[in-house]
From Swiss-Prot:
A motif (Cx9C motif 1) lies at residues 31-41. A motif (Cx9C motif 2) lies at residues 53-63. The gene is COX19. It is found in: Cytoplasm; Mitochondrion intermembrane space. This is Cytochrome c oxidase assembly protein COX19.
């Protein structure tokens, strides 16, 4: 029985890294509250791209950036609205 590859040869798959690289997990739960609010919003919105959920996602990502759990980036690069000018 063949393995499905031409010639029956096994090839090593080379994984592709994520676009933004790896980032540390929030082991200390520093941003857990923001994450829970976002996930609850997504459940209520039936996983639709709701504006208020996007703002909660922004809060969560800001928390991750503030605690060095991800690299800082501009909101437009993350598909989120810019901060309001005050």
């Amino acid at each position: 029985m063949s393995s499905g590859n031409p010639g029956g040869a096994l090839r090593a798959l080379s994984p592709t890294p994520p676009e933004r690289g790896s980032f540390p997990l929030d082991h200390d739960g520093e941003c857990a509250e923001y994450m829970q609010k976002y996930l609850q919003c997504m459940r209520l919105a039936a996983n639709e791209n709701a504006h208020n959920c996007r703002l909660l996602a922004k809060d969560y990502l800001k928390c991750r950036m503030d605690h060095q759990l991800m690299d800082k980036d501009e909101w437009k690069n993350l598909g989120l609205p810019p901060d309001d000018k005050q």
